[in-house]
Swiss-Prot record:
Predominant location category: cytoplasm
Localisation per UniProt entry: Cytoplasm
Organism: Albidiferax ferrireducens (strain ATCC BAA-621 / DSM 15236 / T118)
Chain's gene name: murD
EC number: 6.3.2.9
Protein name: UDP-N-acetylmuramoylalanine--D-glutamate ligase
InterPro entries: Folylpolyglutamate_synth_CS, Mur-like_cat_sf, Mur_ligase_C, Mur_ligase_C_dom_sf, Mur_ligase_cen, MurD
UniProt function note: Cell wall formation. Catalyzes the addition of glutamate to the nucleotide precursor UDP-N-acetylmuramoyl-L-alanine (UMA).
Length: 506
């Protein structure tokens, strides 16, 4: 691991990933300079304490950071958009300096470990607009239950490089890495080669950062590399469009790249995963060839046998969208060679991630769900469809809309919502978009008022869902704070009503 030895490296941005890259580069013997447009970025004290030899530069990101210096590599923090660092990256490219990010450093580290220690772990990667954290955490649990050592890292932490440093120090390099990757981390990365990768879905998000939907989709597609198994949501046309055209081989059928699909419908190919309704019960299923000993004629579709894995009701995570998340996790863990039986027990035990359609309690036969992490339209569409397949939903929407198109909410609100309560800065935009649904649209000035209005609209057996489809910063510190205020409001409402409160205390 001496590619960085005695090299001068420049790190752009001093957040969690920037600090992790600085630690890694210093560990590898590099001379480190960190630049940030802020005079006191959040990790500056940690950098100065842990790496006193590192230089910190505050100011604009301009070409002078690399031109006329002895910098030999530039590493960009994922929070910085291409526009933020364009001047530096273009200057670096012009003079032949490599520029990458934490994922590129992590990939190089694994290549070095393979060369020096014959370390060849399976690497499973997860991306998509929504569901990444749930599928990443669940895949890690399934791999562990499948009997393999595993490290889970990436987008929301811990960072890839800090996790690698910890395992190297402890002598516990895992057999499998499960990593969550955002479009920010994947932007511009071309050397990443996972064993298998999943794209869960694609809906509008971060367009202000990427500049266009096409650029956002292209960044997500980098997750597959050139050779890894592709795990694809077959119900999402933009995801399926990532599958390359078949390669024509002389005297053979055109060869499709290795892939597995999943979705809420029936699987169509051997090895694919899906959902099947049997006598009113929804099952997780996998398609197998009915008779693998029979060779199919050219162009003939193999006869399928659907292997029922477990009822969706046996999952602790709620909603059809979470059943689909479970299928994606099964496909990923299976790609790492994990046995199916132990993984199914793991699925039953998984309780979900905080603020992602998380049940927080029931009173007066109405169940309350916290999906405060639903900060974009796609997340809320999935939450409504997931919960609405079983009951009517009163949904709390609103906040900072980030310039999104709210039109995709019209269909699920029309189908699944009994009422909508609007909060926050972009409530008027949501009202305009949802007017055609003819569902009651109420407005609240505070979360407490929103909860009270939602509860008043609910019937026994309904769900009240906080899934704002918007960022939180107009009214709250962050989405966790929004969730905390929601839970507190629900608890206070139950107490004031003198109702029995079944579930988590706020």
């Amino acid at each position: 691991m001496n590619a960085l030895q005695d090299q001068h490296v420049l790190i752009l941005g001093l957040g969690a990933s920037g600090l992790a890259m600085a630690r890694w580069c210093a560990r590898c013997g590099a001379r480190v300079t960190v630049a940030d447009t802020r005079s006191a970025p959040p990790q500056l004290a940690a950098l100065q304490r842990e790496l006193p030899a590192a230089q910190f530069i505050s100011g604009a990101f301009d070409a002078a950071l690399v031109v006329g210096t002895d910098v030999r590599a530039v590493f960009k923090s994922p929070g910085l958009s291409p526009l933020d660092v364009a001047t530096v990256i273009e200057a670096a490219n012009t003079i032949g300096i490599r520029a990458t990010g934490e994922l590129g450093l992590f990939s190089q580290a694994l290549a070095d470990l393979k060369a020096t220690q014959n370390y060849t772990p399976k690497v499973l990667a997860v991306t998509g607009t929504n569901g990444k954290t749930t599928v990443t955490a669940l895949t890690g649990l399934l791999v562990e239950r499948g009997g393999k050592s595993v490290a889970v890292a990436g987008n929301i932490g811990p960072t890839l490089l800090d996790t690698l440093i910890q395992h190297l120090a402890a002598g516990t390099l895992p057999e499998v890495w499960v990593i969550e990757l955002s479009s920010f981390q994947l932007e511009g990365e071309t050397g990443f080669e996972p064993s298998a990768a999943a794209v869960l879905n694609i809906t509008q998000d971060h367009l202000d950062w990427h500049g266009s939907m096409a650029a956002y989709v292209a960044a997500k597609a980098h997750v597959f590399g050139a050779t890894g198994l592709m795990i694809l949501n077959r119900e999402d046309p933009q995801v399926m469009a990532m599958l390359p055209e078949p390669v024509r081989v002389k005297l053979q059928r055109p060869q499709l790249r290795a892939h597995v699909t999943f979705g809420a419908d029936l699987p169509r190919r051997p090895g694919d995963f899906g959902l099947e309704q049997v006598n009113g019960m929804l099952w997780l299923v996998r398609a197998l060839e009915a008779d693998e000993t029979l060779k199919n004629r050219k162009g003939e579709t193999p006869e399928l046998f659907l292997q029922r894995l477990m009822p969706a009701d046996a999952l602790r995570i709620r909603g059809r969208h979470n059943a689909v998340n479970a299928l994606a996790a099964l496909a990923l863990a299976q790609a790492a060679g994990c046995a199916l039986g132990p993984m199914l027990y793991g699925l039953r035990d998984y309780r979900g991630e905080p603020h992602r359609v998380a049940p927080i309690g029931i009173f007066n036969e109405v169940e309350f769900f916290d999906d405060s992490k639903g900060t974009n339209v796609g997340a809320t569409v999935a939450a409504l469809a997931g919960l609405g397949s079983e009951r009517k939903v009163i949904v709390i929407l609103g906040g900072e809309g980030k310039g999104q198109d709210f039109a995709p909410l019209v269909d699920p609100v029309s189908r699944y919502a009994r009422a909508v309560v609007l909060i926050g800065r972009d409530a008027p935009l949501l009202r305009a978009a949802l007017q055609a649904t003819h569902v009651p649209l109420l407005e609240a000035e505070s979360m407490a008022q929103a909860v009270a209005l939602a509860n008043a609209q609910a019937h026994a057996g309904d769900a009240v869902l906080l899934s704002p489809a918007c960022a939180s910063f107009d009214m709250f510190d962050n989405y966790e704070h929004r969730a905390q205020v929601f839970a507190q409001a629900v608890g206070e409402l139950a107490s004031a009503a003198g109702a029995a409160w079944e579930g988590a205390a706020p």
